[in-house]
C-alpha cells in the first residue's frame, strides 16, 4: 500500500451546557459539536515499526512525551491484535490546549488511517471503547459530522441539518487546560437544551445559539481574562452574527453568513492582533 493522508478538522462547540457531575468527578455535558474546514493532516505509510514525525506551524507547541497519536495507535493495535507498524507524519496547524479538539481530532484521524493501513475493521463497540479511552472528544471527532454530544462525550446523536455558514477561529495563543476550567466553574448545573429544528439560514442558527451558551466561558475568563478580550474583538467585527468560546477555551469563534464576511473579519482581527492565531473556515455540514 502506498502512502495516503487523512484530515483532522478542528472541533467547535457551538453550545456547551454542563448538566451534571458523576460520582467520579467527571462532568456531564450537552453540546452541539461541529467541525471547521481547517485542521491538521496525518500521512500514513507502511513500516515495520511505529513512528511519528511532527511538523507544521504549531508543532513546537506539542509537549514532550507520548503523543496522543501514538497512544491511539497502540490502543488500536492492542484491541485488534495487529503487530504491524506505521510511519505517521503529523502536520500540526491547530494550536494546542485550545478548546478545538486538535489532539482529539488527530487521534480520531489516526484510528481511521491505521484501520485502513492495517486492513482491520473492529466492531463498532470496540472502536467506541478505544476512542473514549483516548479522550472524551475522540468519539465525536471520529464521527466527524455535526453531533449532539452528551454524557462525558460517549453519547452521540446526529444534529439537525445546519445551514451554510462560516467561522472565524481566534486563539490568543494562551494554552488553557480543561481540568482547571471545570474546577473553576460555579453555580447550578444547566438544563439540557438541544437544537431540535434545522435553522433556516446562518442568521437563524445564530438566533438559536444565542438562546443557549457555553457554560465554561465565565471560568475560562476568570483563569485567562484575555478570553474576554478575544470575544469582544470578534463581536466588534462587521457582520458577526455571534461570538462564542469553543470547548474550555481559549479558542473563540465568530459566526458569519458568507465567506467574504468571514475573511474580512479575519483580516481585521489579524491587523489589530498580529500575535493571535486567526483562521477563517467553513462550517462543515
Curated annotation (Swiss-Prot):
Its EC number is 2.7.1.148. Pathway: Isoprenoid biosynthesis; isopentenyl diphosphate biosynthesis via DXP pathway; isopentenyl diphosphate from 1-deoxy-D-xylulose 5-phosphate: step 3/6. It catalyses: 4-CDP-2-C-methyl-D-erythritol + ATP = 4-CDP-2-C-methyl-D-erythritol 2-phosphate + ADP + H(+). One of its GO terms (biological process) is isopentenyl diphosphate biosynthetic process, methylerythritol 4-phosphate pathway. It comes from the Bacteria. ATP binds at residues 95-105. The active site is at residues 11, 137. InterPro entries: GHMP_kinase_C_dom, GHMP_kinase_C_sf, GHMP_kinase_N_dom, IspE, Ribosomal_Su5_D2-typ_SF, Ribsml_uS5_D2-typ_fold_subgr. The keyword Magnesium does not apply. Belongs to the GHMP kinase family. IspE subfamily. This is 4-diphosphocytidyl-2-C-methyl-D-erythritol kinase. It comes from Paramagnetospirillum magneticum (strain ATCC 700264 / AMB-1) (Magnetospirillum magneticum). The lineage of its organism: Bacteria, Pseudomonadati, Pseudomonadota, Alphaproteobacteria, Rhodospirillales.
